[in-house]
Amino acid sequence: MCEISIIVPVYKVEPYLRKCVDSILAQTFTDFEVILVDDGSPDNSGKICDEYASKDSRVRVIHKKNGGLSSARNAGIDVARGKYLGFVDSDDYIEKDMYELLYDNIVKEQADLSICGIYDVYEGKKPVNKPTIKKTVTATEGLLLILHGNIISVHAVNKLYKRELFSTLRYPEGKYHEDSFVIVDLLDRCKKIAIDSKQKYYYYHRLDSINTETFSAKQFEFIEAWVINENKLRGRGKKIEEAAHQRVCFANFLVLDKIVTAKATNLPETKKIVHYLRNNFL
C-alpha cells in the first residue's frame, strides 16, 4: 500500500518517455508507485518501461493490447494500490514538487480532489504564466471554474484524486476528449476541492500529434461530450446552466476552427455547427 498511484499510459513516445518518468521519480513526495501502461506500443517504449521497473521498485509495468488512452488509464486504475490516484501523459513532464503540493492540499483541506496549474508547452515558444488562485471550494464552485475554463482545466493530469472517486467510474474507451466526458461525474462525487493553480505540470503539444492538414471526425466527440454535460447539468441553477451552455458554444467554435484550418468546410456537419452558433451565440 502506498499513498499515491501515478498512472502513465504509454504509446509511441520513445523520444519523450525518459524525461517524463525521470520527472516523476524525482518527486519530493516519495510514497508513491508509478504504473506504466504499455498500450501495445510498436516502438521501444515498452522496453524502456521494463528498464525502469528493473531499476526502481516503485515502478510497475503493464503490457497490454492497444486500446487507446482511456483503456490504458482504466487498466492502471484497476491495479492501483494507492489511497490517491494521479495521471501523467507520457510525453509530458512535471515539476519535482507537484505531487507534494497536491498531496499536502488534499490532506490539509480534507478534500476529495486537488488541482494545480498547467503550462502549455509548444516547440520553440516560452510557456506562458496564467492567473493563479488558491482556495478550497465546493463541487459546484469547482464546476463553475472548470466550465469557465480560464483558470482550471478539465485535464485529468494536473489533479490528485481520492481513489474512491473511481470506485464505479472509468474513462470512456474509444472516445476522443475523454476527460470532458467524465469531469462532471467526477465532480459530482466530490464534496471539497482544493485548488492551488501554481503551474506544476508541463503539457507538451507535439507537432507530430496534431495534423493541421486533415480533420478527424473524432473531433465531433468534443461537442458530444459537452452536450451530454449540459444535459446532466439542467436544473442545477442559472449560473451552472449558462456556463454549461457557453461551454457547448466553445466546443462548437473549437471544432469549427479545426474544420476551417484543415480546409474541410464541405463536411455536412459544418452547416450544423454554423447554424447552432448563429442561433445560440451570435
What annotation goes with each model-predicted range?
Residues 64-80:
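Glycine-rich, basic loop-to-helix element that forms the pyrophosphate-binding segment
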Residues 205-282:
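C-terminal subregions of glycosyltransferases and related glycan-biosynthesis enzymes
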Residues 5-8, 35-36, 63, 188:
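Short hydrophobic beta-strand elements that form part
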Residues 69, 90-194, 204, 208-217:
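Donor-binding/catalytic cores of nucleotide-activated saccharide
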Residues 23, 38-48:
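A conserved acidic beta->alpha catalytic loop
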Residues 1-25:
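N-proximal low-complexity "stem/linker" segments adjacent to membrane-targeting elements
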Residues 31-40, 60-65, 90:
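Short beta-strand/loop segment that forms part of the nucleotide-sugar
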Residues 85:
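Short aromatic/hydrophobic "clamp" motif used to bind/position activated sugar donors
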